[in-house]
Amino acid sequence: MGSFEIPEKHTALLQGEGGSLVIARDVPLPTLGPGHLLVKTAAVALNPCDFKTPAAFPNPGYYNGCDFAGTVVALGSDNIRDGGPWKIGDRIFGAIHGANPSDWDSGSHAEYVKAVSVFSYRIPDWMTFEEAAGLSPCCIATMGVSLFKALELPGTFEEPATKPLDVLIYGGSSSVGSLGIQMVKLTGHRLGHRCITTCSPKNFDLVKSYGADEVFDYKSPTCAQDIRKATRNCLKYAVDPFGEVKTMAICTEAIGRAGGRYSALEKFQEDVCDRKTVKRELTMGAIIIGHGLDLGGRYTRPHSPEMRAWGIEWYKSIQRLVDARKFKPHPIRVLKGGFEDMLEGLAMLKRREISAEKLVVSLDPAVSGLTADSTAR
């Protein structure tokens, strides 16, 4: 593959004052270090953390955003990835730690992205950039850390658990929820672990299509009790993407008599659950790359070479599943207005207007909707 003409500056969505986000022109390109790749962004997916993190930890002038898909246009040193070194022209998708106070130009909401070689995926020839971004590597990383590190769920994709266990994935119609359902089913022998989930009745068929075994209406006043009954008072594992008072109450009350583990993907109130037999943990997907998080309080995490080693192997496992078409993507809604639509999409998420869809913004009309196969013809 030939070389690409790379500008000295580009456009990016940066943090403004008070946690706001602004479109900035003529921003210097990210600086590549060892193990980095420069990616020309074709599409990005939007996540709630993309507006929540800048609001909670504002750093004016810093980059923002996590999920991306695009084309490798420049290489840092040591760019080895499972399957061989990355090359100029490779199609790539992944997640980076956006709004990172320790790395100002780390963020996906930009024309060019600084990706980490060992924490990125190759896009299969049959997949478009929008579809790749819509798989939401940010959610893949977060759910992986939640299920297999925080909850310590038995089984792996390569060696599924022989005994099926009940697992509650709250909010199965969310993008992270639908990924969680599929991961639970893929790590149990034959039919997988038994996945319980919640959502609105209008989305029951959707979550069942991802493999959910039983679905409950989260608005039902007896939701927790119904889950307890369905799991014979033996539920031990619960993932809560929202960490709200109501969602935490349902999850922790659904856990059986013997207790278990609860993983929240958002900060939760400790006093909502007083059950000493339920171990509670705030899970952050950004720790998968092993660097420490110095955000203060419960958001602080130490540097962990062990987590980094696990994360590298996790990415290899996910790549094999993606290549084998084992993941069914979440329904995506593509916005084609570039950075303006990026801001509007984040506002839509903030207003909670999106249900059972993943918002993806196309940044490069020339490659929108194209696969590697279609560009070769």
From Swiss-Prot:
InterPro entries: ADH-like_N, GroES-like_sf, NAD(P)-bd_dom_sf, PKS_ER, Trans-enoyl_RdTase-like. Keywords: NADP, Nucleotide-binding, Oxidoreductase. Disruption phenotype: Abolishes the production of chaetoglobosin A and 20-dihyrochaetoglobosin A. One of its GO terms (molecular function) is oxidoreductase activity, acting on NAD(P)H. Transmembrane segments: none annotated. It is an enzyme of class 1 (oxidoreductase). Residues 18-361 are annotated as: Enoyl reductase (ER) domain. SUPFAM superfamilies: GroES-like, NAD(P)-binding Rossmann-fold domains. Pathway: Secondary metabolite biosynthesis. Substrate binds at residues 137-144, 285-289. Induction: Expression is positively regulated by the cluster-specific transcription factor cheR that binds directly to an asymmetric direct repeat present in the promoter. The keyword tRNA-binding does not apply. It holds the Pfam family ADH_N. Its cofactor is heme. Its EC number is 1.-.-.-. NADP(+) binds at residues 49-52, 173-176, 200-203, 218, 265-266, 283, 354-355. Enoyl reductase; part of the gene cluster that mediates the biosynthesis of chaetoglobosin A which has a unique inhibitory activity against actin polymerization in mammalian cells. Chaetoglobosin A and its intermediates are involved in the morphological differentiation of C.globosum. The first step of the pathway is the synthesis of prochaetoglobosin I via condensation of one acetyl-CoA, 8 malonyl-CoA, and a L-tryptophan molecule by the PKS-NRPS hybrid synthetase cheA, followed by reduction of backbone double bond to install desired geometry by the enoyl reductase cheB. Belongs to the zinc-containing alcohol dehydrogenase family. This is Enoyl reductase cheB. The gene is cheB.
